[in-house]
């Protein structure tokens, strides 16, 4: 009996415990990232932002969470109730499940699989189903239009993100996220990370990640001036909160992906003491926050694109550019003898 427990049940209990701990830490982090997003936006507009609940407004996100939970969920009379309530849950669960393969430090990962990048790309692609379900089940024209926009937008920019991943794959020879970080470990520190040799792809990834997560200036799915609140028009209370939570988890996931692919993951910027004394998870968190700051600044200073401009940028600019970079990177690696063995 003891052997059965140690062989079969104990690994399962460990994985469940790791997953619960990761989700709790991630949700608490999301609360403060949401607050930081509002504070950055306020600072750009020369105002103070949330500053009432808690010291310096640090508890504002938790107050908003409590308010949302205590509200009554309103369901439109013509809505498909089951699909309507399932949509935000699908969006949130898919966003959280991507973190199962993301290493936050050396050995700090729930599932260190060899197709980690492919897994994250697949899970992020599936998140569009939550938006489509919400748009269709609401029985309203604004959410339905937003769902159609979301499907087209995500498909358009996932192609570019796929080519970005192929460029990194050519340099590393593996889709394992830990291997990608270790491949950037060199005596050059920050200059040895892939953001420098693959800078055009870093820019393509950054802009495509904005579009993939429906962030400004590509928030056509939630364009207030056109679609009121987009696919969330009919949502309130806890379902609305789950959509917001899923959106910000997806944003942080993309920031973590950018950190791993281009910014060296948990590696220190200078591979010498005292920088090497700092735990890897601290460097990883700082780099994710830097990526999120870039996301927040785009929201604050860049005007929204028109829908036709969004599609043109994805198909006529990023797709040819990323495809050309794949060819160039492959050629340079082959003829310079730098291809991974």
From Swiss-Prot:
Subcellular localization: Cell inner membrane
Record keywords: Cell inner membrane, Cell membrane, Membrane, NAD, Quinone, Translocase, Transmembrane, Transmembrane helix, Ubiquinone
CC terms in the record's Gene Ontology section: plasma membrane
GO biological processes: aerobic respiration
Source superkingdom: Bacteria
Topology versus the membrane: Multi-pass membrane protein
Membrane listed as a keyword: yes
This enzyme's EC code(s): 7.1.1.-
Reactions catalysed according to its record: a quinone + NADH + 5 H(+)(in) = a quinol + NAD(+) + 4 H(+)(out)
InterPro entries: NADH_UbQ_OxRdtase_su1/FPO (IPR001694), NADH_UbQ_OxRdtase_su1_CS (IPR018086)
The keyword Cell membrane is assigned to this record: yes
Pfam families, alphabetized: NADHdh
Transmembrane intervals: 13-33, 82-102, 115-135, 161-181, 190-210, 242-262, 277-297, 317-337
GO terms for MF: NADH dehydrogenase activity; oxidoreductase activity, acting on NAD(P)H, quinone or similar compound as acceptor; quinone binding
HAMAP family: NDH1_NuoH
Role: NDH-1 shuttles electrons from NADH, via FMN and iron-sulfur (Fe-S) centers, to quinones in the respiratory chain. The immediate electron acceptor for the enzyme in this species is believed to be ubiquinone. Couples the redox reaction to proton translocation (for every two electrons transferred, four hydrogen ions are translocated across the cytoplasmic membrane), and thus conserves the redox energy in a proton gradient. This subunit may bind ubiquinone.
Quaternary structure, from the entry: NDH-1 is composed of 14 different subunits. Subunits NuoA, H, J, K, L, M, N constitute the membrane sector of the complex.
Family that this chain belongs to: Belongs to the complex I subunit 1 family.
Name of the protein described by the UniProt record: NADH-quinone oxidoreductase subunit H 2
UniProt lineage: Bacteria, Pseudomonadati, Pseudomonadota, Alphaproteobacteria, Hyphomicrobiales
């Amino acid at each position: 009996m003891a052997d059965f427990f140690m062989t079969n049940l104990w690994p399962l209990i460990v994985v469940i415990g790791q997953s619960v701990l990761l989700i709790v830490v991630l949700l608490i982090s999301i609360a403060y990232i949401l607050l930081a997003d509002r504070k950055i936006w306020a600072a750009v507009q020369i105002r103070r932002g949330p500053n009432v609940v808690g010291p310096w407004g640090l508890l504002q996100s938790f107050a908003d969470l409590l308010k949302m939970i205590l509200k009554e969920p309103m369901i439109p009379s013509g809505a498909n109730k089951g699909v309507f309530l399932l949509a935000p849950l699908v969006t949130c669960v898919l966003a959280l499940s991507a973190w199962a393969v993301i290493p936050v430090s050396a050995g700090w990962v729930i599932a260190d699989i060899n197709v980690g990048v492919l897994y994250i790309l697949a899970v992020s692609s599936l998140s569009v189903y939550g938006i489509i379900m919400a748009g269709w089940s609401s029985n309203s024209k604004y959410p339905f239009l937003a769902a159609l926009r979301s499907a087209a937008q995500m498909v358009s920019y996932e192609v570019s993100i796929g080519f970005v991943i192929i460029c990194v794959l050519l340099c590393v020879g593996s889709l394992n996220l830990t291997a990608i970080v270790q491949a950037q470990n060199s005596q050059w520190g920050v200059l040895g990370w892939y953001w420098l040799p693959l800078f055009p792809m870093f820019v393509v990834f950054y802009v495509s990640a904005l579009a993939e997560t429906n962030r400004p200036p590509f928030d056509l799915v939630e364009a207030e001036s056109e679609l009121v609140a987009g696919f969330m028009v009919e949502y309130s209370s806890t379902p609305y909160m789950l959509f917001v939570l899923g959106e910000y988890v997806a944003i942080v996931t993309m920031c973590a992906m950018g950190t791993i692919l281009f910014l060296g993951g948990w590696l220190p910027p200078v591979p010498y003491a005292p920088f090497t004394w700092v735990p890897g998870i601290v460097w990883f968190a700082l780099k994710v926050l830097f990526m999120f700051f870039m996301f927040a600044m785009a929201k604050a200073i860049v005007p929204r694109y028109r829908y036709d401009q969004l599609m043109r940028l994805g198909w006529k600019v990023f797709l040819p550019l990323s495809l050309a970079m794949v060819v160039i990177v492959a050629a340079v690696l082959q003829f310079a003898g730098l291809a991974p063995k």
